[in-house]
């Protein structure tokens, strides 16, 4: 472990030196990439240096304790030794976690897609509620949510919502939300008080840079139309809404929330790029023999990941067998109650894998 940490520290120093060079400073793309790398390395290096310093202090304190004759001083030194011995295991655990291979998409912004599944109107209502919960959660994380497309349900709610979430390490947390979310509750229109079950599908896709993927324009069909509001009525006299269809795959993307056609066209292509990259990533994952060890669930939109039982205010995450009775808090934005245990479980499994290797 320590040889790896030494290598990380060496790379940190290299990047720091490179950022001082005029040729790097004048190349904004390279400069931003190195600054991002420096930030990631610094998190590890600071903990490593703290660990190293406290290890040295512990050794010195133990030597001092052996040589010290004064009873009062010996007691003070013992307290210092006790504190250091209590702190070091936690720092060592932090370092082990920091060395877990990182998902290359973790730092990326995301495209969030929520679609009503089985359950008709009730599914559409929950899709909208789930999105609002994510918006509140994003706010607590300092992220920005921007609506891309919204299709209203027949009785309110949403048949489909597409939004972008931008900020610090969005995908690293939101990726755990991909899959089928099942809701159990009594609809307001249900006179007999029977519990209905409905589903909502969530897809979280990492955004990609335009330069990362190339699409021949002959493979794309672009259509323009007027933006539609509630009930399908036109809300724009100009054809600002844009639909982009990728002919080889059949991927169909529509954007209408932007004020101009150019804005909607740009966003539509960003979503298309992200979806095409996701297809490539899924192919690569299927070829890997240890996919299930490297992630919690497949992230596949057909996988049932969670059940929300409103009568019992209970949420169960089926991937790790987690059950909590804090449904109201979660739907108000406290998704960390679910996401943080998922991250901790992933880290524990990854550490087991490192030990067995």
UniProtKB/Swiss-Prot annotation:
InterPro entries reported in the protein's UniProt record: PCRF, Pep_chain_release_fac_I, Pep_chain_release_fac_I_sf, Prokaryotic/Mito_RF, RF-1
Cellular location(s): Cytoplasm
Post-translational modification note: Methylated by PrmC. Methylation increases the termination efficiency of RF1.
Cysteine pairs bridged by disulfides in the record: none
Any one GO MF annotation of this record: translation release factor activity, codon specific
Pfam families, per database record: PCRF (PF03462), RF-1 (PF00472)
SUPFAM superfamilies in the cross-refs: Release factor (SSF75620)
Keywords of the record: Cytoplasm, Methylation, Protein biosynthesis
PROSITE patterns: RF_PROK_I
N5-methylglutamine: residues bearing it: 233
Record's GO cellular component terms: cytoplasm
Primary role: Peptide chain release factor 1 directs the termination of translation in response to the peptide chain termination codons UAG and UAA.
Family matches, as HAMAP family: Rel_fac_1
Family: Belongs to the prokaryotic/mitochondrial release factor family.
Listed name of the protein: Peptide chain release factor 1
The species this protein was found in: Bdellovibrio bacteriovorus (strain ATCC 15356 / DSM 50701 / NCIMB 9529 / HD100)
Top-level taxonomy: Bacteria, Pseudomonadati, Bdellovibrionota, Bdellovibrionia, Bdellovibrionales
